[in-house]
Curated annotation (Swiss-Prot):
SUPFAM superfamilies: Elongation factor Ts (EF-Ts), dimerisation domain, UBA-like. Its main location: cytoplasm. It comes from the Bacteria. Gene3D superfamilies: 1.10.286.20, DNA helicase RuvA subunit, C-terminal domain, Elongation factor Ts, dimerisation domain. Belongs to the EF-Ts family. The lineage of its organism: Bacteria, Pseudomonadati, Bdellovibrionota, Bdellovibrionia, Bdellovibrionales. Transmembrane segments: none annotated. PROSITE patterns: EF_TS_1, EF_TS_2. This is Elongation factor Ts. The gene is tsf. Residues 79-82 are annotated as: Involved in Mg(2+) ion dislocation from EF-Tu. Associates with the EF-Tu.GDP complex and induces the exchange of GDP to GTP. It remains bound to the aminoacyl-tRNA.EF-Tu.GTP complex up to the GTP hydrolysis stage on the ribosome. It is found in: Cytoplasm. The keyword Membrane does not apply.
Amino acid sequence: MSISATLVKELREKTNAGMMDCKKALEATSGDFNAAVEWLRVKGLGAAAKKADRIAAEGAVFAELHGNTGVVIEINSETDFVARNDGFKALAANVVSHLAKTNLEGDVLAQAYAADSSKKLGDLFTEATATIGEKIVLRRQEKYTATATSLVHTYLHGEGKIGVMIEVGASKPEAVSNPALKTFAQDVALHIAAMNPMAISSEQIPADVVSKEKEILTAKNLESGKKPEMIEKIVEGQIRKFLAENCLLDQPFVKNPDMKVSDLAKSVGKEIGADVTVKRFVRFELGAGIEKKTNDFAAEVAAQMKGH
């Protein structure tokens, strides 16, 4: 049967599949539009499965507030330009909206999708992989909800390269609505994005991290010819410096290095008439810790030619 160009165009607009695939789908289903959508979905899901072993190390970080709840996620793709795709951005918006309404316990991808209970959240990624043509994965997610004595703030840097979420507290509930506290949260979130602290205070840095650093510093000092009896004292000073450089409250404030972040908290506290604290924070940097795959170009071309 003859398939009209208009019907092919409508199917393409609905599914975002290629023109030839849409034509094949309509021919295979005798022009039944809904059956053609399902045919493409099945074909797309098959294509998505083939992409499962690819490495997704690009993408973007997204951070948003939904009322008093903040959500930060990292979604990975195979190439950086996909993060600018409208479909990719729409996927991120839907995922953030879903996570703001649910808990993060267990496998979040197995959760019934909040906007359509006939789907699981993971189905959105399978469909996006098929539609966009690259492996799309949810790598990590975090969610904070403010209390009567705290506020949550999110900050995005560099078009989704770094996302920060922070919860700051005030000792008096009435101080939470003071604009100065929100400004403090924004300033500290920006600082965290720039300076990448390990923890809020030295007490929160794991003992094994400090122990490992001591080992490295001791070995370096021995290697440089320092006297063994002096090394312990030298390393103690170096560890103090290490902690100061990696603890948020002890770091020089990025917008005014003459004061520490802890000094900024005290200053804002005086302004709003309440003790101000940083309760927790999370910082996602795109692709951090992912080993990117590097292919031999000649081998890649040879592999592609096998299919022709």
